[in-house]
């Protein structure tokens, strides 16, 4: 396996840095996008949600001016300051009164901080909220609602309280001259000039609105007031409001959508404007500023409004808030200009605008920087790190820090590995052989290290080990969170807790510390402490444990190294006993005798060091492998005890290595084979499809990241080998964090959680990976468990989501999956839990008692559904609105009836053209009965979102011919009186059977008639069977269901009888088509004229076989089950609704023409 590099891909740690710095200080903040209209909120932390009482889903996509927190006591001037700071992309502190969702008021200090990207452009704003005072605790009246309404009695106390707070500062105005002169410096006298920070009074409920990109025009005469007049205007006098373009009332709120095609927010970034605009103090942004301006007795020197403040502003640019500004100094052209021209901004249709260009005169520089007296990073307590930039950032590496995966560190590690191997081999050899030989040999000349090359190498090794310790203090490491740590302090602490002690003991140069003491044996023993470095070798070589060949080689080297150590010990035992032994039976004496180099009486002589070492190594290898030949044998007790130990070690080594070599190779190659097999497949795929290099690198990095995360374990393959009950427990354990902490799952039972855990799947995404593309089908719901993502529409960031956020679409509102309205891209390494739509609905169907709780508790942080790409959405009943009803009711007839039941009496409220037979449509000229044949057909089902009174109305074909009177419908059927009185409760039976009557009418009279689709009066369920047909009363749902079933049975019977009647009609037509009489008949063939033939014999007519009578009989049969008390509709003209037998007599006057040659005559 390669070196564990950690998360080294470029990540956007903007959100993580802000959260890490703010959460520990209980900060309450929001993040807004500066590149979209109204600066929509794209992130808010939990502290802000707790402060205002709104959930994150309710705050997302709202304007960052937080106008939804405004209330009666919200100062208009403070709201204007926030809007001006957003317009000018400048830092500012504003004190403002906000209202929570429950209506309680609190005084808040808002810090507006711009955030720049790597190019120096402001792309985001951070607004930090700090509660200064709870206004309910200082004697405020009953809780005010944060919804604007008409002025009430609390206005005067609220205004007086605010005035008392500002009075000491306002009285200081008498000690200075006015800084505003007519036509003087600053451009105050210029026509159309607008002073931004003007109002110190709280905003009253208004009927006008002011968007972020618009500033109201003030009266020009305010700029020319003197000191006394100015103070008087502030204390008591109020100027009339400026003229508006229209004298009538205007809406109090003008909505600005973030995107016309988006469905995220419909709120506006607007601040209210009082009808009574009080006089203003020019160039004063707060009461403290007014106090500070008292010291300046002389007015500022004259300068143009657009350039006068440019020079002091250059020094203010050094107060940077981003990394890019700390690196380079942006030119003055990159900052917001002092003068903004209203030609480039969007006009307000509710405010009057002069023909000349209007300018916003920016406050003076003291006002611009008065509320920001220190760096924003210090104000927001960001510590040493400056405000992060919103961009992909590689892991920040400290200066003089070495990456643990860098090429230099890899080469250095291999060098240290070679030195450790040298130490492991030569340190025992020197301690056992060379030091004793030096003591016994002649005295060495005074040549220092030149005569001892091993001593020089040992000195170099000691120096290299000390340097390695210093390098380890500056080498990065990977923590438990897979993050690369480069901070020197954290690296030092990590090294002290780890391998520092072992490395330090192994690097001590003992031969230099006790040089000249004469104790060479002690130095040799102390130098064996270098063998502790072997632990580092084991740690370094652990990365190669996945490769079977490397493991086998390491085991063989370990076996040889142990044999080398044992050979040194074997020689030390024989050398220690040789001088003190009277009998010459030791293995060294036997070796000297065999080689002809015996030891003399003084203990000198004997074999050479080379012969001794080779013989000792031969003995240890033969003993470890259990292949002893006997030519070198232990004779003394010490030698025999040592031989026993060697045999025990050899048996263990032989059994564990050589006896199981095949098993070891097979075991070690299993994971390696899987890794290389998968990597080979990936590379073959890349080669076959010719994947470009950037994409190829992403594939390989993702594969390595996924392999290090899962170690190549296929979770699905592992789970399939266990029973389902055990699979559910394992999945419940793997998803325990999500199921325990996510609010929608808290009320679920254990069985429901087990079923949900079986459906969840975990997804890992590296930085820059796109999880969902715009236009993709939304088939799953995503839960973020680690990392942060961004949602983009084009190149515009609309939301930043972090841990515990949910994105997707509300499945309970839509019957079919929709399409995504943006791209979802990972900013950091992310772990997400996703559950497919069908799986979630299946589980909720199995546990209906939990379904309602889940849908009510589920808050999707960002809705990805694009309602504009699906026909009929967002309110079409084909896609949404009553999803549970569509799942339970499959018949369209029942769905239409339920909608009519839920909206009784709403047909008449739809207005002209919506009800087919209502009075509103009849009274309109050219109503639905008089429309031209070219009019298009009506929609079969109306959207539920279009209005509360709209309901689906079925279509029917009606004959359309020449114009008729306004009160008469097509086919000669005027509207009945009861239907006119209650258009929403027309007779359902007549509506259901009218199609049958029209069929026969079409056969009877088809000349000059056309057909078009016209909406009928909807037939509500309560007026079906045994109640008065004109009654608009409502019935319980169970009664409606029973009556629907009865109506369905009647329709079935009608269909059966209609089929029989049709067969009779076809038989009659076949008889009339017989033109040639039979041979036995005396009747001649009739002439060509259709009316010249008359029957020879008088034949009684058959009323039951006529077309009209068949229609009447069918309607009578369909209504025969009506109760006796059911009233009848009054008949007008030839209307055939609910025909009775008494009407059949008038139809017998038309005889049926038959040929006299008919056999039945």
From Swiss-Prot:
Name used for this protein in its record: Voltage-gated inwardly rectifying potassium channel KCNH2
Listed Low complexity bias regions: 930-941
All copies of domain PAS, residue ranges: 17-88
Residues recorded with modification Phosphoserine: 239, 245, 285-286, 322, 353, 873, 876, 1139
Glycosylated sites: 600
Extracellular-side segments: 427-452, 519-522, 571-613, 635-640
Annotated organism of origin: Oryctolagus cuniculus (Rabbit)
InterPro entries: cNMP-bd_dom (IPR000595), cNMP-bd_dom_sf (IPR018490), Ion_trans_dom (IPR005821), K_chnl_volt-dep_EAG/ELK/ERG (IPR003938), K_chnl_volt-dep_ERG (IPR003967), KCNH_animal-type (IPR050818), PAC (IPR001610), PAS (IPR000014)
GO BP term, example: regulation of ventricular cardiac muscle cell membrane repolarization
Subunit architecture: The potassium channel is probably composed of a homo- or heterotetrameric complex of pore-forming alpha subunits that can associate with modulating beta subunits. Interacts with DNAJB12 and DNAJB14; chaperones DNAJB12 and DNAJB14 promote tetramerization. Heteromultimer with KCNH6/ERG2 and KCNH7/ERG3. Interacts with ALG10B. Forms a stable complex with KCNE1 or KCNE2, and that this heteromultimerization regulates Inward rectifier potassium channel activity. Interacts with CANX. The core-glycosylated, but not the fully glycosylated form interacts with RNF207.
Segments for region (Disordered): 233-286, 872-985, 1121-1161
Role noted for this protein: Pore-forming (alpha) subunit of voltage-gated inwardly rectifying potassium channel. Characterized by unusual gating kinetics by producing relatively small outward currents during membrane depolarization and large inward currents during subsequent repolarization which reflect a rapid inactivation during depolarization and quick recovery from inactivation but slow deactivation (closing) during repolarization. Channel properties are modulated by cAMP and subunit assembly.
Mode of membrane association: Multi-pass membrane protein
UniProt xrefs under Pfam families: cNMP_binding, Ion_trans, PAS_9
Places the protein is found: Cell membrane
Gene3D superfamilies, alphabetized: 1.10.1200.260, 1.10.287.70, Jelly Rolls, PAS domain
Domain free text: The S4-S5 linker acts as a signal integrator where it both couples voltage-sensor domain (VSD) movement to pore opening and closure, as well as providing a binding site for other domains that regulate activation and/or deactivation of the channel.
CC terms in the record's Gene Ontology section: monoatomic ion channel complex; plasma membrane
Residue ranges that the UniProt entry lists as topological domain Cytoplasmic: 1-405, 474-497, 544-549, 662-1161
Tissue expression per record: Detected in heart, both in atrium and in left ventricle.
Basic residues: compositionally biased ranges: 885-894
Entry keyword set: Cell membrane, Coiled coil, Glycoprotein, Ion channel, Ion transport, Membrane, Methylation, Phosphoprotein, Potassium, Potassium channel, Potassium transport, Transmembrane, Transmembrane helix, Transport, Voltage-gated channel
Post-translational modification: Phosphorylated on serine and threonine residues. Phosphorylation by PKA inhibits ion conduction.
């Amino acid at each position: 396996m390669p070196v564990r590099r950690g998360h080294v891909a470029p990540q956007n740690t903007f959100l993580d840095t802000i959260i890490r710095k703010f959460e520990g200080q209980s900060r309450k903040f929001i993040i807004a996008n500066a590149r979209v209209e109204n600066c929509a909120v794209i992130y808010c932390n939990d502290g802000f949600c707790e402060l205002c009482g709104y959930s994150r889903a309710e705050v997302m996509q709202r304007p960052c001016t937080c106008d939804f927190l405004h209330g009666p006591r919200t100062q208009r001037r403070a709201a204007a300051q926030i809007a001006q700071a957003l317009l000018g992309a400048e830092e500012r502190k504003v004190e403002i009164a906000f209202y929570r969702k429950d209506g309680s008021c609190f005084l808040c200090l808002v810090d507006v901080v711009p955030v720049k990207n790597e190019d120096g452009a402001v792309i985001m704003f951070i607004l930090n909220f700090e509660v200064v005072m709870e206004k309910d605790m200082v004697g405020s009246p009953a809780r005010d609602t944060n919804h604007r309404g008409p002025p009430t009695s609390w206005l005067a106390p609220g205004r007086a309280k605010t005035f008392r707070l500002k009075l000491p500062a306002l009285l200081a105005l008498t000690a200075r001259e006015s800084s505003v002169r007519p036509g003087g410096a600053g451009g105050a006298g210029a026509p159309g000039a607008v002073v931004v920070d003007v109002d110190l009074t709280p905003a009253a409920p208004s009927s006008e609105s002011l968007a972020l990109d618009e500033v109201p025009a003030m009266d020009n005469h305010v700029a020319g007031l003197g000191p006394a007049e100015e103070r008087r205007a502030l204390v008591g006098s109020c100027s009339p409001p400026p003229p508006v373009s229209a004298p009538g009332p205007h809406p109090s709120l003008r909505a600005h959508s973030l995107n016309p095609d988006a469905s995220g927010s419909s709120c506006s970034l607007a601040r209210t404007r009082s009808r009574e605009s009080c006089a203003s103090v020019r160039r004063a942004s707060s009461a403290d500023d007014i106090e500070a301006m008292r010291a300046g007795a002389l007015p500022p020197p004259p300068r143009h409004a657009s350039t006068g403040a440019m020079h002091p502003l250059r020094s203010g640019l050094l107060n940077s808030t981003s990394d890019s500004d700390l690196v380079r100094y942006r030119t003055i052209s990159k900052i917001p200009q002092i003068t903004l021209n209203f030609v480039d901004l969007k006009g307000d249709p509710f405010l009057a605008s002069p023909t000349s260009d209007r300018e916003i005169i920016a406050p003076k520089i003291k006002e611009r920087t008065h509320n920001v007296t220190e760096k924003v990073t210090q104000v927001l307590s960001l510590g040493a790190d400056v405000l992060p930039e919103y961009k992909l950032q590689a892991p920040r590496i400290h200066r003089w820090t070495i990456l643990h995966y860098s090429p230099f560190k890899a080469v250095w590690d291999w060098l240290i590995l070679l030195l450790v191997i040298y130490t492991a081999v030569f340190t025992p050899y020197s301690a056992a052989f060379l030091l004793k030989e030096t003591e016994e040999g002649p005295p060495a000349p005074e040549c220092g290290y030149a005569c001892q090359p091993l001593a020089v190498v040992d000195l170099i090794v000691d120096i290299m080990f000390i340097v390695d310790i210093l390098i380890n203090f500056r080498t990065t490491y990977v923590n438990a969170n897979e993050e690369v740590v480069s901070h020197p302090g954290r690296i030092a602490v990590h090294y002290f807790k780890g391998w520092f002690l072992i490395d330090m003991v192994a690097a001590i140069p003992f031969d230099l510390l006790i040089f000249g003491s004469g104790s060479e044996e002690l130095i040799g023993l102390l130098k064996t402490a270098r063998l502790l470095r072997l632990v580092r070798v084991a740690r370094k070589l652990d990365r190669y444990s996945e490769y079977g060949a490397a493991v086998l080689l390491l085991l063989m080297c370990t076996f040889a190294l142990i044999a080398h150590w044992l050979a040194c010990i074997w020689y030390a035992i024989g050398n220690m006993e040789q001088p003190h032994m009277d009998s010459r039976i030791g293995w060294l004496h036997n070796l000297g005798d065999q080689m002809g180099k015996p030891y003399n009486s003084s203990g000198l002589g004997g074999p050479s060091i080379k012969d001794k070492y080779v013989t000792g190594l031969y003995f240890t290898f033969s003993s470890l492998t259990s292949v002893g030949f006997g030519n070198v044998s232990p004779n003394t007790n010490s030698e025999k005890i040592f031989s026993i130990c060697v045999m025990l070690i050899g048996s263990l080594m032989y059994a564990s290595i050589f006896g199981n070599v095949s098993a070891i190779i097979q075991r070690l190659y299993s994971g390696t084979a899987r890794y290389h097999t998968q990597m080979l497949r990936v590379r073959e795929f890349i080669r076959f499809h010719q994947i470009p290099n950037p994409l190829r690198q992403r594939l390989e990095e993702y594969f390595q990241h996924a392999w290090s995360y899962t170690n190549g374990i296929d979770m699905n393959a592992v789970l399939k080998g266990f029973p389902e009950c055990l699979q559910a427990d394992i999945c419940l354990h793997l998803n325990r964090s999500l199921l325990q902490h996510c609010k929608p799952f808290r009320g679920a039972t254990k069985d429901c959680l087990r079923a949900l855990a079986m459906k969840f799947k975990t997804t890992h995404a590296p930085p820059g990976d796109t999880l969902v593309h715009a236009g993709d089908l939304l088939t799953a719901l995503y839960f973020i468990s680690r990392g942060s993502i961004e949602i983009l529409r084009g190149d515009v960031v609309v939301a930043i989501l972090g841990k515990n956020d949910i994105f997707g679409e509300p499945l309970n509102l839509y019957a079919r999956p929709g399409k995504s309205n943006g791209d979802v891209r990972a900013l950091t390494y992310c772990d997400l839990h996703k559950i497919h739509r069908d799986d979630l609905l299946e589980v909720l169907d199995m546990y209906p008692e939990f379904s309602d709780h889940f849908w009510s508790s589920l808050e999707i942080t960002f809705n990805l559904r694009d309602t504009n790409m699906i026909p009929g959405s967002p309110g079409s009943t084909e896609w949404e609105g009553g999803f549970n009803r569509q799942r339970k009711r499959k018949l369209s007839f029942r769905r239409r009836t339920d909608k009519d039941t839920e909206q009784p009496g709403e047909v008449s409220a739809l207005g002209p053209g919506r009800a087919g037979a209502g009075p509103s449509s009849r009274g309109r000229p050219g109503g639905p009965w008089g429309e031209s044949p070219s009019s298009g057909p009506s929609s079969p089902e109306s959207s539920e979102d279009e209005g509360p009174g709209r309901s689906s109305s079925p279509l029917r074909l009606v004959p359309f011919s020449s114009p008729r009177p306004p009160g008469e419908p097509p086919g000669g059927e005027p509207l009945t009186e009861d239907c006119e009185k209650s258009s929403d409760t027309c007779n359902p039976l007549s509506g259901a059977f009218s199609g049958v009557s029209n069929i026969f009418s079409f056969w009877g009279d088809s000349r000059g008639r056309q057909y078009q689709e016209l909406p009928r009066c909807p037939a509500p369920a309560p007026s079906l069977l045994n109640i008065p047909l004109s009654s608009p009363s409502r019935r319980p749902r169970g009664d409606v269901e029973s009556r629907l079933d009865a109506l369905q049975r009647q329709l079935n019977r009608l269909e059966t009888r209609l089929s029989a009647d049709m067969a009779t009609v076809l038989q009659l037509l076949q008889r009339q088509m017989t033109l040639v009489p039979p041979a036995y008949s005396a009747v001649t063939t009739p002439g060509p004229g259709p009316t010249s033939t008359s029957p020879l014999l008088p034949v009684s007519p058959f009323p039951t076989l006529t077309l009209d009578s068949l229609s009447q009989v069918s309607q009578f049969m369909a209504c025969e089950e009506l109760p006796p008390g059911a009233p009848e509709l009054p008949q007008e003209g030839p209307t055939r609704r609910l025909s009775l037998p008494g009407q059949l007599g008038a139809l017998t006057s038309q005889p049926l023409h038959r040929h006299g040659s008919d056999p039945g005559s």
